Amino acid sequence: MFDSPSNEELSRTLAEPEEPIIDFSHVSIAFDGRPVLEDVSFYVNRGQTLCILGRSGVGKSVALRMLMGFLKPDEGSIRIEGQEITTLSEEGMRAIRKRITMVFQNGALFDSLSVRENVAFPLRERGDLNEEQVQELVDRLIGLVGAEDVVDVLPSSLSTGRKRAVAIARALAAQPEVVLYDEPTTMVDPIIARHLGDLIQRLKQKLGFTSIVVTHDMRFAERLADLVLFLHQGRAQFFGPLKGFMASQDPHIRQFLALDAYVLPSELGDSPLVTRA
């Protein structure tokens, strides 16, 4: 005979699914009367990577700025692990920003500080580490992003791709639960874009980060995404698994994928456009 399950086991079995770490619900925002996002909903579970796709100007980065509290929605709810953030004061948002960090397009590094000092900055701000511990963590983070050869260099001397790698290291120094990436492959060559994609994927696998990546680069998204949010004219045209997005017959999605299938030659000249392999 089988033993009857205990009350504790029944409770675990019947427990509700884990609440998403990020939950956008019917969010709208307009600038100067012009709708930017309209009734947009999506969620991200812990450890997942969401890629937000769409053409320029459809509000992809606006969603990240609302998550950070830099913008407030006109309507809708934004919840972080069940906590509504749209009504939080700036002080309340500072606590949220200890758990969620953002890697900006320009890296947002301090120009007057070396790579080492940039990565050390958030560690020193914590105030609970001695200098030996700070330097040990800095070396570990710089090694993680492959920037060991530029530790004493100022950001102005770095390429765009290197700046973003260092910005990721500095973001990780804050020990966040969620990392937001705003167009990480813009203005970098395909080799650097692949390196950044490998880095973001490795961080997910090793450290279990939850990530949201805003990008227009479908190749990049294919390598990273568990979930896809596709924005068209400010609305969520698709939200769901990557496989479903790739198979969608929505005409706007098919057009986006078709245009992305073409790449310019590496050098200008008479070479024709070539399709993605």
Identify what each model region corresponds to.
Residues 154-158, 162:
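Conserved ABC ATPase signature
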Residues 175:
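Conserved catalytic motifs of ABC-family nucleotide-binding domains
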Residues 68:
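Helix-to-loop junction immediately C-terminal to a conserved catalytic motif
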Residues 113-121:
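Short coil-to-helix segment of the ABC ATPase nucleotide-binding domain corresponding to the Q-loop/switch region
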Residues 179-182:
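Catalytic Walker B motif of ABC-type/P-loop ATPase nucleotide-binding domains
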Residues 83-84, 131-149:
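Conserved ABC ATPase "signature" region
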